[in-house]
């Protein structure tokens, strides 16, 4: 029984789910916005916010944690250079989820998640 479990399962095993969230986080930070299902967008939101908060901290240990999570080391350096001035006046809420039309093949709820 999964009482009070906060992580959405996304229909995948734990290792596949973690890899999916890592790749979605990496691509969202790289491109600024991605189109995915609404459930995946809600799941990746917390991971992206965690990475941006680490980048705002800017310490060496925070940089190493981000390098261990994101797939692109150069992207981490760019994030740590950009995030402190871009999000200096925000304490959270770095992303926005906008609902779009349902996917044609399976009628899944789609959304665009973007960085503010």
UniProtKB/Swiss-Prot annotation:
SUPFAM superfamilies: Prokaryotic ribosomal protein L17 (SSF64263). The keyword Ribonucleoprotein applies. It comes from the Bacteria. The keyword Cell inner membrane does not apply. Disulfide bonds: none annotated. Part of the 50S ribosomal subunit. Contacts protein L32. This is Large ribosomal subunit protein bL17. It comes from Crocosphaera subtropica (strain ATCC 51142 / BH68) (Cyanothece sp. (strain ATCC 51142)). The gene is rplQ.
């Amino acid at each position: 029984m999964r009482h009070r479990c906060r992580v959405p399962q996304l229909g995948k095993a734990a290792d596949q789910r973690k890899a999916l969230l890592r790749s979605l986080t990496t691509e969202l930070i790289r491109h600024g916005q991605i189109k995915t299902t609404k459930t995946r967008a809600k799941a990746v939101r917390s991971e992206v916010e965690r990475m941006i908060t680490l980048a705002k901290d800017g310490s060496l240990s925070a940089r190493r944690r981000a390098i261990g999570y994101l797939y692109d080391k150069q992207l981490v350096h760019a994030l740590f250079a950009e995030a402190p001035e871009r999000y200096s006046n925000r304490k959270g809420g770095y992303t926005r989820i906008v609902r779009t039309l349902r996917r044609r093949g399976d009628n899944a709820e789609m959304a665009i998640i973007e960085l503010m």
